[in-house]
């Protein structure tokens, strides 16, 4: 059996308007994105993700939405061409390594200043790439908070949106 990619399941093919997603993020809202096939594994890679503005402390809001403990870490999704400006150490598109943040980004790093960085390549094929490009164009920030879109219920998601 050959491993093709980290995606499986139902393939959601809906139009995602990157501009509208970024409009919501700029209002300091947390945005849910569901597009393409679901990721298989422990990390959100952009096809089933909650996204947030990493420039502000939004951890408590996301923890409330997800009903999870405060100590649980978040991760940044960053445009590949900017990863070395913000982090040092091994990084890849599957968040398999821990990198050290070069600057304070407390919304997307652990208490020790490290993060499991998702490097978003130009050819990744995920909706997260055009969202990040729009985000960078409008803010100058090449990353977003990215956590898995696994909520207790549909109501929780609507309640906090």
Which residues does each predicted region cover?
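Flexible beta->alpha loop and helix N-cap segments adjacent to enzyme active/binding sites
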Residues: 1-161
């Amino acid at each position: 059996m050959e491993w093709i990619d980290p995606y499986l399941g139902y393939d959601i093919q809906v139009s995602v308007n990157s501009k509208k997603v970024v409009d919501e993020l700029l209002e300091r809202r947390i945005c849910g994105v569901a597009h393409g096939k679901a990721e298989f594994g422990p990390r959100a890679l952009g096809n089933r993700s909650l996204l947030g503005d990493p420039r502000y402390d939004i951890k408590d809001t996301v923890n409330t939405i997800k009903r999870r403990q405060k100590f649980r870490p978040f991760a940044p999704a960053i445009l590949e061409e900017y990863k070395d400006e913000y982090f040092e150490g091994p990084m890849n598109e599957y968040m398999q390594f821990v990198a050290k943040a070069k600057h304070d980004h407390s919304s997307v790093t652990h208490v020790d200043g490290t993060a499991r960085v998702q490097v978003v390549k130009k050819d990744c094929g995920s909706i997260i790439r055009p969202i990040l490009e729009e985000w960078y164009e409008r803010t100058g920030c090449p990353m977003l908070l990215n956590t898995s879109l696994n909520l207790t219920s549909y109501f929780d998601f609507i309640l906090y949106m």
